[in-house]
Amino acid sequence: MDELSDEELAQFCQIANLAYRAGKPIISDQDYDFIYLDALKNRDPDNLLFKFIETEGQSFSEEKVLLPEAMLSIDKAYSWDEISKWIKRLEKSAMQISLDLSAIQIKATPKLDGFSGFDDGSRLYTRGDGKKGSDISRVFERGLCVFNDAERGLGAGEIVIKKSYFKKYLAHSFEYPRNFQASLIKEKALDEQAQKAIIDKAALFIPFIKLPTWSGLVAELVAKFDQIVAQVLVMVDFDVDGVVFEAINTDLKTQMGANRKFHRWQIAFKENKDKAHVKVLNVIPQVGRSGKITPVVELEPTLLSGATIMRATGHNYGLVKEQGLGVGSVVELTRSGLVIPKIIFVLKPMPVDIPDNCPSCDKPLVWKSDFLTCINHKNCPAQIIGKMAYFFKILANNDGFGIATIEKLYAHDIRSVSQIYALNIEDLVTIGFGEKTSMNLINQLNRSVSEQVEDWRFLAAFGMHRMGLGNCENLLKSHHLNDIFDLNLKEIANIDGFAELTGQIIVQGLISIADEFNHIYQYGFNLETTILTKDLQTLTHELFDKKIVFTGKMNHSRDDMKKHAKSIGIKVSTSISAKIDYLVIGDKVGQKKIKDAEKFGVVVMTETDYLSKI
């Protein structure tokens, strides 16, 4: 890891994550969590990996279907201090709804290390990106059973293999249980040992609501935390990589809600007690997309929590200067979350070497608060490359445009995303890509244009300062994408969640990207338009905020009906479950959908009935 730049580390984490979720891990789960991901978190806390649900690997079909309900990730804590802060957030929310703090109830369950899925009773989906996943219903058709012979349709859970069974019958053939779990899901026919594991009920789907639990009042959790963790970790004969804690009180969960990635009323605890005293060999400056210089600390190779650590982040040069983190320093090191190397404190300070010039463009650096910064934003190679790669990463509907590809394009005078979209196969071959690779890259560019993305994601991909995904969505809830470049400071500052300082930054940011935005926008991206808040507030129809499924042949285009439904505040799903409110039927409806609706108590209405209610 010591040879990796920030961008390369992020790319490696993405590759490792995809390989892990595809059932072909290239490093252990602990190494990923506590070495690489933690290093990335320390170097680049705003990286996309920490803001969005981790997607599964490309081993699954690229054809994705809408999940019956969103499957969020779980926030993680690696110490009692972080759990304590989570409890304080619970208590703060409880006070806001006048809930007695002594009445807060907590549930703890084992955090399974399997393949996440959602079972709606008729289909099984992978988690995918949390909104769309792959249909892997074939795994039930192959005979997979639900844990404890429970019924189908119990929602989110994981496909797992019993630890004792894996150790006895499968460890000689598979390096990790995930490799075997993946073989159950793949489209190819099952081999004999996989089929036997299913028959023996060693491989199972476990709905989370069927997991054994500890439950009690929050005061008991505080008093017996270590004991409860130890108890929960051994509750099941499956691979477990932590303990999930969640509030039980329904009104408290509603109050706390969720962000894009996880529910705030839930957290997963992972523990790492290993520490080491390590000598610093070097401190190397690296340039990020925004021009911030991150000090990368090279360390004497040290075995920690089963992995050899050779690198950690110094966060910023202000901290390096304050701590005396220089060549020859001795630091106390741990693996935060059992994955990422983290310097706890400097035991032996040494003189530090503060760089004067940017390591990428050699221009003088300036201090901005605790950060050394390269302000040569338009011409610094590292920043230009980082911004181009960032566009494709945020857009998230393409493959192939990682740092290595972008660096090669930069070496052949490509300096902007709009220049990339103007390339053809012949151009790429001339640059030095193979013909097949060139064809794939062009196909991915076309895919990024045709495959629908949210308009706020498209805007965020341009990488304006302070305009991440959340702020871009907030802006587009008040003004349409086509109108934002005409907004003045007052109009932006008046948006809820913004203020004058943020407004000034946004105005300048929009000016800086306007030309590039127009060049790229002309390619006709398939953008999903954000509904304006003022329009949502005028929606008073009976089906507002209800979940519906359309089925059968309609008088209107099914796609048009879905788009219209979403535009007026209706949540559209693709399959029947207990979470659905209405099934809207046209002609030639399959009886299975009708029976599923009856089974789950879903109200059935005709297309005419539906139109009359909106």
From Swiss-Prot:
Matching Pfam families: BRCT (PF00533), DNA_ligase_aden (PF01653), DNA_ligase_OB (PF03120)
Catalytic reaction annotation: NAD(+) + (deoxyribonucleotide)n-3'-hydroxyl + 5'-phospho-(deoxyribonucleotide)m = (deoxyribonucleotide)n+m + AMP + beta-nicotinamide D-nucleotide
HAMAP family hit by this protein: DNA_ligase_A
The gene coding this protein: ligA
Protein name: DNA ligase
UniProt-annotated binding residues for Zn(2+): C358, C361, C374, C380
Function field: DNA ligase that catalyzes the formation of phosphodiester linkages between 5'-phosphoryl and 3'-hydroxyl groups in double-stranded DNA using NAD as a coenzyme and as the energy source for the reaction. It is essential for DNA replication and repair of damaged DNA.
Keywords: DNA damage, DNA repair, DNA replication, Ligase, Magnesium, Manganese, Metal-binding, NAD, Zinc
Protein family membership: Belongs to the NAD-dependent DNA ligase family. LigA subfamily.
Recorded GO MF terms: DNA ligase (NAD+) activity; metal ion binding
Enzyme class: ligase
Gene Ontology BP annotations: DNA repair; DNA replication
BRCT domain location: 538-614
Keyword set includes Zinc: yes
Cofactor(s) named in the record: Mg(2+); Mn(2+)
EC number: 6.5.1.2
Residues annotated to bind NAD(+): D29, Q30, D31, Y32, D33, S73, I74, R127, E158, K270
CDD domains: BRCT_DNA_ligase_like (cd17748)
Active site: K111
